[in-house]
Amino acid sequence: MNIDNDLRRIALQEQQLQFERFDLDTAWKLGVTLRRMAAERKLGCVIDITLFSMQVFYAALDGATPDNPNWVRRKRNTVFRLFKSSYATGLSLLKQQTNLQAKLGLADAEFAAHGGSFPIVVKGTGCIGAVTVSGLPQRDDHNLVVEALAELLGANHDELKLES
């Protein structure tokens, strides 16, 4: 893994994986897509889609743990605060050899700079929420979200996915 390459690719993901519009039906389709992918691969995880106003999708699959919802909340809080993916935040901090507490005064109990939460962006509006996965290694959490977004938006996942 090359941090600079990953950060460039995540910036491309965040630029291309944006919606023309996003409503509750779109949230359902995204959530069901993520759940299908996770179930087919037998991935024990939690899936959450939350807009700034309310939670609009939640699913826990076999293998998820009681800690996963807290990880979802903390990663989602990071997206809501910084308007970029939690994985990009974590990699940027790793590159700077710091953390959220030291750099921004954000408590670990409330924020997590670990992969798996991705901003829901509506073109011309900005970030309106976050889609989050927790339960896998952080890179895999991030990759699953990106794959589902690419499928739903008709984007070329091969051009967007992180290098192995």
Swiss-Prot record:
Transmembrane segments: none annotated. Coiled coil: none annotated. Signal peptide: none annotated. Pfam families: HbpS-like. Belongs to the UPF0303 family. This is UPF0303 protein Smed_2872. It comes from Sinorhizobium medicae (strain WSM419). The lineage of its organism: Bacteria, Pseudomonadati, Pseudomonadota, Alphaproteobacteria, Hyphomicrobiales.
